[in-house]
Each structure stands twice: as C-alpha cells, then as structure tokens.
C-alpha cells in the first residue's frame, strides 16, 4: 500500500482539528540568563530534542516521594516496601502508556542508548540487522559490537515510500536463493540464520520528520523479521502504541520525555530477553546462586524484566518516567500535537522569509514532523550563529552533527570523508563548516520563545552579530575582551 502522511505515526485528522492546549508547566520556565550585550532575559529553551526540562508535575511528584525513598526489592521496612510498590506500579504505568501486549516486558535502563545496546546484547547469534544510515548513533552503532551479527546499512531514502521499498528489497535479498548485492554490509564472515531485526526511528532527531513506522513494521514481518522502534524523539510528541504500530520493541529515554532523572525504557517481546544471558550480572537479576561440587557457581536467572535490571534500580528515575507518561496522557496528545504543529508552522513560515536559511529535510519541506527543525545559514558558521543566538538573545539551540553524522552529511551534500565533528565548530566564526543548527520545542514551549527565535534569526542575518566571537575548547564563545 502506498505510504501517505496519514500513515505516519499519529499524523491524524484529529490532531489537526483538536483544541490547542496551553503550554504545560515545566521546571525552569522563568529562569533568567545574562546577555553579553547587557541585562537579562527569560531563557528560551529551544533544544528540547537534546534533553527536555522536567514537567512541573513530574518534579512535584518526585519531590513528594523523595522523603520516602527506600531500597527496591531489597528490604522489609515500610519505605522499602513502599518504594518497591512504586517501582512496579511505575512499570505498569509505562506499559499502559506504550500499549504493551500480553506477555510484553518493560525493562528499565539508563537511556535509549542503553536500551538499544541491551537489545543488541540479547540478539540470537547470527541475527541479521537492517538499519538506515539516517539513524541516530544510538540506533546505528550498537549492533557492530557483536562479532556474530551481520549489519546491513540502508541508504537514506528521499520519501517514506522509498524507505519501505528499500527495506523490502533488502529483506527479500536475505531470503534463500536471492542475490544480496547493492548494500554495504559489515561482519561478512558471520554465519546466516533465520533471525533478522530492523531498527528504525519514529521521528528524526535531525529533521523531525515522521517515519512510516506501520508500513516498515508490516514489511519486516512479511519477511519474517522483527522490528525495534527508536522512539526517543517520537514518544514526547505523539502517542506510541506497540500493538497499534505492530512493532516488536520500543526504546526511549526519560530525559527526552520531560523526566530527566537518568532512566530509560526497552519494552516489547519477552522471548529473546528471556533466552539471553543477563545484560548485567549482579544482585536482583538472579533467583538463586549456589556453589557446585566442582567449585563453580550455578545461577538461576530471573525470566522477568529483572533479569536485565541487575543492581539497585533508579526508582526516582523510573517514577519520574511514569509520572510523565501519566501527565502527557491526561493532557491529551491530540491537543498537544495540535499546539506543537502550530509552533512548527510558525517557525517554518518565519524561516521561509529568510532566503539565506535552508531547512534540512529528507522527505520534503511539507513532510509531517515533530517540533524539530535543522537548518543552515548561507555565509555563517553554524556554531557562530548558535553562539550568537545564546549570547545576544538568550536562546538555547544546538549546533553540530547531532550524533547522526551520516544523515547530516547526506543532507548537507558532503562526502563521508569531509571534516566534521558532532557539536564542535570546525572553523573560525564566519567560516563555513560541516554542521547545522537545530531548533526544537515541545509541550512546555511558550509561543513567545518561538517568536523571539524567528526575530533573532532575521536580525542576525540582516544585521550580523553585535559581538565578537572566538573558538575556545571546541566551542564558539563571546570574546569578552573585545566588543563586536
């Protein structure tokens, strides 16, 4: 079936027609920061894609629990029992948020990166992994750590339909008797098995574009493969339902979901998780440990999520994720999506009025996206531009390659050997460099912060920076020894 905008995750008519909600209260909303030109201004946090501030409700819930903190699954006292119940109730809340199916497991980790490395660690030997080169490094790199895994890197698609077609062709070529030409592979010495895994993002951390997750999942399953969804950028903006999207696993981070307290999630099918050795060995992952007659040790590992949660768990981080899941659900994703789309259109319309600005995209300027846009400005070093937004306007954005080097190189038309490094300026202020600027926003972003950003871009392009800048320790910073 052809891929359309309506087939992308949660890109529904109801999101367009829903009532627009007010920004959700977030911690630090009224923080003032100094300007290099003098005075202070309310900080405009427009780097939500990197890490989101805590929802005020999440902070309040965590603060209310903190005096009652106790060890989880490790104590008979009241606070330990309360904390254990809170931890497991949080697991159930996350399962509801993700639409987990009967038999699915919710494993708590440190982050999306940790979740995908966990999945890589439990893959059956000789599994073939298919991943688009457009992925964040958290999705792109973990599979290479297994010498017995073969990885197929798929070229960047230019339309959602091309993404599905590319995946279907690659999966068909792995089947017995088929050729396997046209794709770059690693681990060529690995044996072949029937197991295959597709790893795909739900929303790009560079362009914000929504990927055709349902169609990719259908293609994977039609060819006997499984699929994991990197929802780090999707879950904070759109509902994620394992059953509805028909994905096998989903991974995301609390710090992207307005719960920045050091926890993440891997949720989905239990069989590979139960069959593999624990991701970490230690207390809590085992049911019994006994010495053998020969002097060794026999271990009976848990078959629940605890198998991969060795060590004292981060109950505050887990509770924060559950609180964020509940807060977003109660706020209503339809109204949250509707408001965010208004902000997206506001930024796109404003940047379109600046000829020097080029917004980066894979699927086209009108592709559905979450509140993430990356762009370059003709005649500007992106690091210099981002530094000026911060120092002169109190606006926090990100510059660099966004831990998605192959994708940004593709979008900028640069070869794989072109110099460039994530997050660091590659030239002096005013020189061109292989990096871009990213602006991102979400449930807590007020309209006036977006409007200030658009005005600042226009002023910088028209009038230039009002201050001098220099490179220091890999960062572009105001030169306080000289006025601009």
Region roles according to the model:
Residues 1-484:
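Pyridoxal 5′-phosphate
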